[in-house]
Each structure stands twice: as structure tokens, then as C-alpha cells.
């Protein structure tokens, strides 16, 4: 599913006029891909786990895609709850992240603030998706198709 999301982002950037290849060897150029299950002390996963107030025992899987530069509000979080009992709590964590992002961007860059206001949070079974992106509906479609 994460690969399909990265492919969609690369397609969208190309359609918007970005000429360079964005997806190289499975990596999305210009984006940090954070594996929340990576316990390596050199990994940035701990920063995001603390920021979101996540407990890794709630997760079977978790990934975040964010731009390397902090001038874009794009943020895609894909979580798989360890069990169904964790889904509602994880959804609340994602809703808190949206509130935090709204507070950050409403004072910083108005165009990015609009993007955050249009954020989408979806759940399907044990999967959760958080999307702040120019075309959130495209990422939601990839999410839904991947779970069929």
C-alpha cells in the first residue's frame, strides 16, 4: 500500500510539471519516509512517536511520509493497529495531529493552512490513513483500492 501511495505522489508531481523522476529505487525523492516500527536510535521514528504520543505496542505497522523541507504541510500517515481495540485510540491520535497542524500552519503559510484544513482521516478495519496533501482524494482512493 505504501508503495502505491508513493507512486501516486510521483504521478501527481509529474502531472503538475515536475520533470525530474521523483520515485527512485522505491524512494520518494524530497520526502522522508519514516518507519515507526524502526527501533534504531539513528532513526527519526522516535521523534514522530513522541510527537504523536504513539505507543508502538498499539501498532502492527506504521509509516509517515513528510517533505524534507518544512515549507510544505504535506503529511501522510499510514497505520495498522495491532488489534481492533486500538483503532479508536489511534484515530484520536491522528485527530490531535490534525489540530496541532492547523495551529502551526494557520500562522505560517496560508496556502498550506488550507491544505491542512482539507485533511482526511480514514479507517478501514485495522488500517488508518491521515492525509494532508494537494489531492487527498487520490491517496484515499489508493488506500481504499489496496484494501479491497
Task: Please provide the spans of the model-predicted regions.
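Soluble, non-membrane globular domain cores that form compact, hydrophobic packing
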Residues: 1-75, 81-148
Amino acid at each position: 500500500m505504501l508503495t502505491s501511495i508513493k507512486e501516486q505522489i510521483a504521478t501527481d508531481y509529474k502531472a503538475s510539471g515536475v520533470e525530474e523522476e521523483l520515485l527512485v529505487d522505491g524512494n520518494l525523492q524530497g520526502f522522508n519516509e519514516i518507519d515507526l516500527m524502526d527501533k534504531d536510535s539513528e532513526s527519526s521514528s522516535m521523534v514522530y512517536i513522541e510527537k504523536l504520543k504513539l505507543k508502538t505496542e498499539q501498532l502492527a505497522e506504521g509509516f509517515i511520509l513528510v517533505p524534507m523541507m518544512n515549507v510544505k504541510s504535506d503529511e501522510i500517515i499510514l497505520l495498522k493497529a495491532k488489534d481492533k481495540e486500538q483503532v479508536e485510540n489511534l484515530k484520536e491520535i491522528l485527530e490531535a495531529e490534525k489540530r496541532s497542524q492547523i495551529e502551526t500552519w494557520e500562522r505560517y503559510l496560508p496556502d498550506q493552512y488550507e491544505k491542512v484544513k482539507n485533511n482526511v482521516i480514514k479507517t478501514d478495519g485495522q488500517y488508518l490513513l491521515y492525509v494532508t496533501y494537494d489531492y487527498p482524494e487520490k491517496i484515499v482512493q489508493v488506500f481504499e483500492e489496496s484494501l479491497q
